[in-house]
Design a protein with these regions (language model features):
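TPR repeat positional signature
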Residues: 43, 47, 115, 119-122, ...
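Long, repeat-rich segments with strong aromatic
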Residues: 244-275, 279-285, 373-399
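Short amphipathic alpha-helical coiled-coil/interface segments
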Residues: 151-154, 279-297, 404-407
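Acidic/polar, glycine-enriched structural segments that form the non-catalytic walls/loops
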Residues: 1-34, 130-142, 152-163, 243, ...
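Extended glycan-interaction surfaces of carbohydrate-active proteins
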Residues: 2-38, 65-108, 168-249, 288-379, ...
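Internal, well-ordered domain-core segments that constitute the primary functional module
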Residues: 114-188
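Core register positions within helices of long alpha-helical scaffolds
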Residues: 49, 121-124, 128, 261, ...
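Alpha-helical support elements that line or immediately flank enzyme active sites
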Residues: 43-73, 321-331, 384-400, 404-407
Length: 445
């Protein structure tokens, strides 16, 4: 790690300092300039990183997020910090408080969701609480008792409102809901979105990221914002969204995360004597969505695909999402071995030009690869963390350790960048990204 600049001790101290600097009191901004609010899956990963520092503060992070949960069970993808501007679209563009019957009374939120990684954060909080005294364990267990129903309602909403075809796969109505905003996965589906007349807007991201090659184009953004307008037209109603949205895609990666998270939450429920009916539902959803993921896979390689509901077409792309079955399991052994070889081979982690052996968001051999552009090529440390954690959970200790070691080598420059250029290691996007620091803290914790 020294060749990049910082020792493990120095890196952990810098990561902890960063999270303290981004702490707004009861929430952590995803990044101080580009993302000055709370993002849903960022908050879960931030809680993972806070847990080794302070179980109590990690609990506050998730409490704040769950306090913004919608009445139908949805956890919104943004909870806006009071008095903080500098992000578009903000509350005045979403208008969820005015238009959505299920929106929370207190916090201002967006009207879409993000990947359900929160059970993982709860598990890490409980894990770290066991290393401390009775008081800290009590804080974690009291949180679980208080928020168990919120977590189950969140999973129930995903399993019902977002499995619109009963396929065991989560349908997204906006690419932002995937967390992989401009991935090549969505190109064909976005091409069918026709942005009509809508109120003018100014992109705040260009004021922070001046190298526009790192960010989605203006024409892409028009489609993103038009989808928000479509949601507003139907008052963010679940049934109407399923019927009316121009963009409706079954996301195999989010579905795999959901299956995995259901199993994690079910195990937590069993260990903490939660209602048998909840645990049973969680296990059933885990199995249903695992089967839904496996049903998308290529017979030989095991690579997973998304599905465009609107045009009835499978979407095959050389992106990190093709490895969804490695998260949730369920593939026949030979297919799984083949998929692991692909993950570690020259199309992804083993590409000879990569500076670090971690998964790029899009394969360097793909025609869609762009080394500097967001989810079209760069390496995201939080994705390295997710695969490392999942591989450990699945009993692949050596593979998990390799990703951890390579991820730490990459992060040892101390920039805690949102993402990195895969060949040069140049930090890109937002600096001081909270979830990057959180991944480092968990790895070093």
């Amino acid at each position: 790690m020294g060749e990049r600049g910082f020792t493990s001790t120095q890196l952990a101290a810098r990561a902890a300092y960063l999270l303290r600097g981004n702490d707004l009191g009861t929430m952590t901004s995803a990044a101080p300039r580009l993302y000055p609010h709370m993002w849903s899956w960022d908050a879960a990963f931030v809680a993972v990183g806070l847990a080794p520092l302070s179980v109590e503060r990690a609990v506050v992070e998730l409490d704040t997020l769950l306090s913004a949960q919608w009445k139908n069970g949805m956890i919104p993808h943004i909870v806006f910090a009071n008095g903080v501007d500098g992000y578009f679209p903000g509350p005045s563009r979403w208008e969820t408080r005015e238009l959505a019957m299920h929106a929370p009374v207190g916090p201002q939120t967006s009207g879409i969701t993000q990947p359900p990684v929160h059970a993982i954060a709860v598990q890490r909080i409980l894990d770290h609480s066991k290393r401390h005294g009775r008081t800290t364990r009590a804080v974690a267990e009291e949180f679980l008792d208080r928020r168990w129903e919120n977590l189950v309602r969140w999973h129930r909403w995903l399993a019902t409102a977002r499995d619109i075809q009963g396929s065991g796969r989560i349908t997204l109505f906006h690419g932002w809901e995937s967390g992989m905003d401009n991935s090549p996965r969505w190109d064909a589906s976005y091409a069918n979105v026709v942005a009509e007349q809508m109120p003018a807007y100014v992109r705040e991201d260009h004021a922070v990221i001046t190298d526009l090659s790192m960010r989605p184009s203006n024409s892409e953004y028009d489609r993103y914002i038009w989808l928000v307008e479509e949601m507003k037209q139907v008052g963010y109603d679940d049934a109407a969204l399923a019927e009316k949205m121009s963009f409706a895609v079954e996301d195999v990666f989010v579905s795999a995360i959901f299956s995995m998270a259901c199993d994690v939450l079910a195990t937590i429920g069993e260990e903490h004597s939660k209602p048998n009916s909840d645990v049973r539902d969680l296990r059933e959803w885990a199995e249903k969505f695992r089967k839904g993921v496996i049903a998308t896979t290529d017979q030989r390689s095991g690579a997973a695909r998304d599905y465009d509901v609107r045009v009835g077409r499978w979407i095959s792309t050389d992106t990190i999402a093709m490895f969804a079955p490695l998260l949730c399991g369920g593939l026949p052994r030979e297919q799984e071995r083949t998929l692991l070889r692909m993950f570690e081979g020259t199309r992804f982690c083993g590409h000879p030009d990569l500076l670090f052996a971690v998964p790029p968001s899009t394969s360097p051999v793909s025609k869609d690869f762009r080394a500097r552009e967001y989810w079209r090529g760069p390496v995201w440390p939080v994705m390295t963390w997710l695969f490392s954690w999942a591989f450990s959970r699945r009993g692949w200790a050596e593979r998990s350790l390799t990703l951890r070691e390579e991820g730490l080598r990459q992060a040892s420059d101390g920039s805690f960048a949102e993402y990195y250029e895969p060949f040069t290691g140049e930090p890109l996007g937002s600096m001081q990204q909270s979830w990057t620091a959180a991944a480092v803290l968990d790895w070093l914790g």
